[in-house]
Amino acid sequence: LYDDIVIKPTWEVLTDTKSDDIVIEIDPGIAFGTGSHETTKLCIGQLKKYLKPGDTVFDVGCGSGILSMIASRLGAGFVHGMDIDELAVRASEENAKLNHMGEDKIKFSCGNLLADNYIGKGTTFELDRSTIKEAQHLDVDRQYDIVVANILADVIVPLSAVIDPYLTENGYFITS
């Protein structure tokens, strides 16, 4: 992917890595995000450029969790990945476990920041093995140093109008 970032599908065997490579093992399932798409590479490049150790990151439309996990391995202090698709959230959680990333550093939730046109609010959901239920209406209770959204332009455009409350004063909004 990059000289020092390797995305390894669970079904492949790595043969050529360096000791300082960041290796992310992933099983995308039906969720978007294997790391090979050009837009994903653009977002990774911007994360490498702007992320500082200890930064907080909000991955909106996290898909398989690939950008969340890379941000964590690049030194983010905490990463929150959110997706509107319950299956994507489950895939992200499984991929984080596969890469030995604990919930103290990386968390995933199901939600929609554009729900009901509430600026700065969204709906999150609690997931269990058999049901999905609305848990709370999410107020902006945390700001992030970086918000990354590798999703369709049709979503990024309206999202850009509501993302400001989630960013710290000098935060970055990375989109592709």
Language model: regions and residue ranges:
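N-terminal auxiliary segments of SAM/dcSAM-dependent transferases
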Residues: 1-17
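Active-site beta-alpha loop architecture of Rossmann-like, nucleotide-cofactor-dependent enzymes
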Residues: 14, 33, 154
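A short, charged helix-loop
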Residues: 20-28
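Conserved SAM/SAH cofactor-binding pocket of Class I
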Residues: 30, 34-114
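S-adenosylmethionine
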Residues: 84-176
